[in-house]
Amino acid sequence: MDHAEQTKSAEFQKAEAYIFKRLKKELSPTLSYHGYHHTEDVMNAAMQIAEAEKISESDKELLRIAVAFHDAGFIYIYQDHEERGCRMVEETLPSFGFSAAQIQLICGMIRATKIPQRPISHLEQIIADADLDYLGRDDVFPIAETLFKELKIYANLHDEEAWNKLQLNFLSSHHYHTATAKKLRTTGKEEYIGKLK
């Protein structure tokens, strides 16, 4: 890695550290699902998928920044938090040396996590799959419970039967996008659907 690449990588790390610090400090404790822990979880899943999908190191760095910011908009608003997160990216990342083209790619990835997901690029597919990685994992029930708890506050959803119906409707229309997520998570997701019925 040459000096210019090292400097760029250091700036990426500073930007990531900056937003993680804000997420830890400023996300509401009532965000039982979309808390700091969710961003950490998505980061782990995104890096696992990116590795398996053979993504370049420079694209992984952009992906890491997109993951770090993907739910940062929750600091300010609940609905349309993705757009608020993109605004934060546009306001913040130029000071860390990010180009307009990089910012555009990062915002594309953030927008790809909006439900219903409509990712276009490979990186957008990776972040979309990472954001919902838990749906096909063994820990899906406790994680889903944190989302139900959050929606009781933010979406006035209180009835467990309505919650299960909402989940089934969502799960029936959801699909993973990358070959890696399809391979790793589809069977687990189908088992989860079976248990909800």
Regions found by a protein language model. Give the residues of each.
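Active-site-proximal substrate-binding core of FAD-dependent oxidoreductases
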Residues: 100, 105-106
